[in-house]
């Protein structure tokens, strides 16, 4: 008896305050983000095209349908969260994809977060104007 492959693969991606939950199913390459078509959700955002980079690097573009739920953050953070989520889900499809994705940085979670505002300052680092006299 052959081992049954799961029909759905899951990956989570995070960037800044955005969290993306990605579900991949074998299909014809349809990508749905929060119930909308990918192009409609990210209309005109050039950075969003990079979210699909993992599909291009592994040669799986058009082979999987993706259902993505993303919340928090802005468009750029959400696009990068989706990018990481797709890459992690593709690793579950085939662990050999790691060799193609790792050198491109697709499996690295970007650790940069917003620095907190400190008391006595106007912003995180911006100090009030200084006057000698």
UniProtKB/Swiss-Prot annotation:
GO CC list: cytosolic small ribosomal subunit
Biased composition (Basic and acidic residues): 107-118
Region (Disordered): 102-133
Basic residues bias spans: 119-133
Source superkingdom: Bacteria
Keywords from the UniProt entry: Ribonucleoprotein, Ribosomal protein
An annotated Gene Ontology molecular function: RNA binding
One GO term of the biological process aspect: translation
Family of this protein: Belongs to the universal ribosomal protein uS9 family.
HAMAP family: Ribosomal_uS9_B
Protein name: Small ribosomal subunit protein uS9
């Amino acid at each position: 008896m052959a081992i049954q492959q799961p029909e759905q693969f899951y990956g989570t991606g995070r960037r800044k305050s955005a969290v993306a939950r990605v579900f991949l199913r074998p299909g014809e390459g349809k990508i749905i983000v929060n119930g909308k078509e990918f192009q409609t959700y990210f209309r005109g955002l050039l950075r969003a095209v990079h979210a699909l980079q993992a599909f291009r690097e592994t040669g799986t573009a058009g082979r999987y349908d993706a259902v993505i739920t993303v919340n928090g953050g802005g468009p750029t953070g959400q696009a990068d969260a989706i990018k990481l989520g797709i890459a992690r889900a593709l690793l579950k499809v085939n662990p050999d994809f790691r060799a193609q994705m790792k050198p491109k940085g697709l499996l690295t979670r970007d650790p940069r977060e917003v620095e907190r505002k400190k008391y006595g300052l106007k912003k995180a680092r911006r100090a009030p104007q200084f006057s000698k006299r």
